[in-house]
């Protein structure tokens, strides 16, 4: 897997899992940070060579390299929500890249809530996909929660960039609980609200390195980003029909205990799209952290079937 135009990037918090590399991807929003793993040897094309867009073509009889995947994190999240999960994909022969969306963690954070519209997040995703060479060889796309809202829209806007779409713990339209999200986020994203959140988290810190990550991320994530994402979550459009018309293979998956979007909504969308539907055992809203091996099995099987023409 090659990512074009990248710049060096230090990890946000703590150490990276072995074989995971952190980079910055220049976009219209600024540099978005990303973590990736290659199932073989990670390939980075330096910024000075980014216009080359070189891709190896398999020789006759040689098996093509597995299609890489782009992973998009959810609301209040970042690439770190997938960093521990990347080695599970590599163990199953999959290369993948997760990035922090604009305003998340150590990614670029343009000033002003007007810079956090649905189209802005979608545009970033498309730029990252192109940096991964999707214009030449379409990639698998996965969006988690709010990231699924962005992924769904990106697949409709630029279906030619993607081999498949996985909608992970995300729904086609806002559930009832999301209606109050902008008001809640307005309170939590204020300076006082963020300090209170960080203090509350600090009272329960353990030796788990993710506790440190969550506390640090709560303080540095852009307030404008949180507000923009909150408003999107409360009113984003249902694009199920255009997604079906795109012809892209779709997987809908979530943890068995996930209640953010109703299970019935997931099942109805899967039926409408003709999508594969998988429920991950022993997991709730973030199966990549709660039962990573099971989720990796689901994804690897889906992607392998797509590449073999079995979907």
Please place each PLM-identified region on the residue numbering:
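Active-site loop/oxyanion-hole signature of alpha/beta-hydrolase fold enzymes
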Residues: 28, 41, 47-48, 91, ...
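Conserved HGGG/HGGXW glycine-rich cap/lid loop of the alpha/beta-hydrolase fold
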Residues: 33-40, 44-109
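Flexible "cap/lid" loop of the alpha/beta hydrolase fold
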Residues: 152, 156-157, 162-191
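Conserved alpha/beta-hydrolase catalytic His-Asp/Glu region
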Residues: 176-178, 191-245
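Conserved loop-alpha-helix segment in the C-terminal half of the alpha/beta-hydrolase fold
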Residues: 250-283, 289
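Catalytic active-site module of serine/aspartate enzymes centered on a nucleophile-bearing elbow/loop
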Residues: 275-311
């Amino acid at each position: 897997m090659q990512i074009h135009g990248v710049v060096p990037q230090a990890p946000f918090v703590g150490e990276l899992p072995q074989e995971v590399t952190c980079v910055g991807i220049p976009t219209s929003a600024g540099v978005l940070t990303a973590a990736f793993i290659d199932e073989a040897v990670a390939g980075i094309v330096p910024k000075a060579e980014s216009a080359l867009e070189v891709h190896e073509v398999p020789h006759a009889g040689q098996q093509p390299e597995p299609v890489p995947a782009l992973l998009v994190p959810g609301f209040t999240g970042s690439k770190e929500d997938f960093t521990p999960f990347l080695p599970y994909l590599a163990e199953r022969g999959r290369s993948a890249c997760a990035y922090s969306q604009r305003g998340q963690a150590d990614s670029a954070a343009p000033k002003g809530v007007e810079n956090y519209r649905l189209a802005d997040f979608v545009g970033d995703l498309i730029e990252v996909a192109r940096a991964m060479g999707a214009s030449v060889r379409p990639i698998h796309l996965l969006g988690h929660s709010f990231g699924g809202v962005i992924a769904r829209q990106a697949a409709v806007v630029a279906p030619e960039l993607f081999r498949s779409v996985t909608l992970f713990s995300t729904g086609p339209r806002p559930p009832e609980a999301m209606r109050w999200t902008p008001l809640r986020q307005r309170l939590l994203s204020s300076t006082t609200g963020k300090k209170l959140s960080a203090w509350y988290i600090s009272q329960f810190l353990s030796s788990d390195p993710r506790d440190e990550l969550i506390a640090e991320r709560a303080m540095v994530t852009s307030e404008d980003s949180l507000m923009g994402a909150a408003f999107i979550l409360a009113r984003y459009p249902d694009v199920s029909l255009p997604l079906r018309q795109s012809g892209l293979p779709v997987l809908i998956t979530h943890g068995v205990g996930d209640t953010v979007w109703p299970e019935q909504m997931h099942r109805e969308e899967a039926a409408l799209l003709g999508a594969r539907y998988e429920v991950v055992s022993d997991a709730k809203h973030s199966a990549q952290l709660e039962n990573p091996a099971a989720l990796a099995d689901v994804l690897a099987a889906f992607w392998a079937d797509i590449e073999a023409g079995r979907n």
